[in-house]
């Protein structure tokens, strides 16, 4: 349970930091977002999508068979499928490749 709570707090901190980073953007950047910010947000998406899978998987293990079974109040099948959708729908591999391209272009901007 402690690992599950820690994972939730890590995810919350990641999102809170990203919101703060967005808020710090100068108004002049609203039309053209700096590449470093784009890389940072892409990295947030990748990290968050991996972390949510880990969190739901840990919850499933805590619930045991009741979480694994389809028709119980503790069933986590839908949540696990939704957690994986974050990595699948907007593919993390493609985002990593985009980040690599931007980093190779920017070299030293971050």
Predicted regions and their residues:
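Surface-exposed loop-to-helix/strand elements on domain peripheries
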Residues: 1-3, 27-38
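Short, polar/charged, Gly/Pro-enriched helix-capping and turn/loop motifs at alpha-helix termini
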Residues: 18, 25, 62, 66-69, ...
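Glycine-rich phosphate/cofactor-binding loops in nucleotide/flavin-utilizing enzymes
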Residues: 66-110
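Charged, glycine-rich active-site and insertion segments that engage polyanionic ligands
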Residues: 33-68
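Charged/polar positions within long, soluble alpha-helices
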Residues: 13-16, 20, 53-61, 85-88, ...
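Extended amphipathic alpha-helical segments enriched in small hydrophobics
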Residues: 1-25
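Generic structural signal for well-ordered, non-transmembrane alpha-helical segments
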Residues: 2-9, 42, 46-53, 81, ...
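Alpha-helical structural motif
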Residues: 7, 14, 44, 55, ...
